[in-house]
A protein has these predicted regions:
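Acetyl-CoA-dependent GNAT
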Residues: 8-11, 15-90, 101-103, 107, ...
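Conserved G/P- and acidic residue-centered "switch" motifs that form tight phosphate/ATP-binding loops
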Residues: 95
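Conserved GNAT acetyl-CoA-binding A-motif
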Residues: 108-121
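Conserved N-terminal entry element of GNAT/NAT acetyltransferase domains
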Residues: 1-9, 157
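Conserved catalytic-core motifs of GNAT/GCN5-like acyltransferases
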Residues: 117-119, 134-152
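Conserved active-site tyrosine of GNAT-family acetyltransferases
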Residues: 128
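Conserved beta-strand edge residues that scaffold enzyme active sites
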Residues: 32, 122-123, 142
Length: 157
């Protein structure tokens, strides 16, 4: 498996992976439709951010997107958001997510990022805490009259 920069032409493939991975958790289809815009990866997003794919046998099996904030006067204040980290359902549990996460942290460190933050799907929060992230709060994410809270996590690369 190799991890490489995503090509803008792969945006639709990345969107498909994100949607399929979200479905993996058994959410109702109308919830998936509600989240579709948040899970859509545009060519412009790929161009403007640090988007990397895990590829094996010519197939993209997962990806992440690291959105790095502006450089601050004091470099130690630079932060990033792990906007996406998705693995195709056929490959969940194979270590691809871990490899993508570790690659994202290495790239964040190389970019002088002090902290990486993310809002995790509740089903993925355990993965991030096993990778060293700590919960710093919660984000309201109500849907369909259901109160949902997403764990807000932080990790120092």
């Amino acid at each position: 498996m190799t991890i490489r920069r995503a090509a803008v032409e792969e945006a639709s493939v990345l969107t498909t992976i994100a949607l399929e991975a979200k479905r993996y958790w058994g959410y109702p289809e109308h919830w998936i439709k509600h989240w579709e815009s948040d899970l859509t990866v545009s060519p412009e997003f790929v161009r403007d951010n640090h988007v990397y794919v895990a590829e094996a046998d010519g197939e993209v099996r997962g990806f992440y997107a690291l959105c790095v904030g502006e450089e601050k006067e004091h470099e130690l204040d630079r932060k990033a958001e792990l906007e996406h980290l998705w693995v195709s359902p056929d490959f969940i549990g194979t270590g691809i997510g871990k490899e993508l996460f570790l690659d994202a942290m290495e790239r964040a460190a190389a970019l002088d990022v002090r902290d990486v933050e993310l809002s995790a799907d509740p089903n993925a929060a355990g993965f991030y805490t096993r990778m060293g992230a700590t919960q710093i709060g919660e984000v309201d994410s109500p849907i369909d009259g259901t109160e949902r809270k997403l764990p807000r996590l932080k990790i120092t690369p």
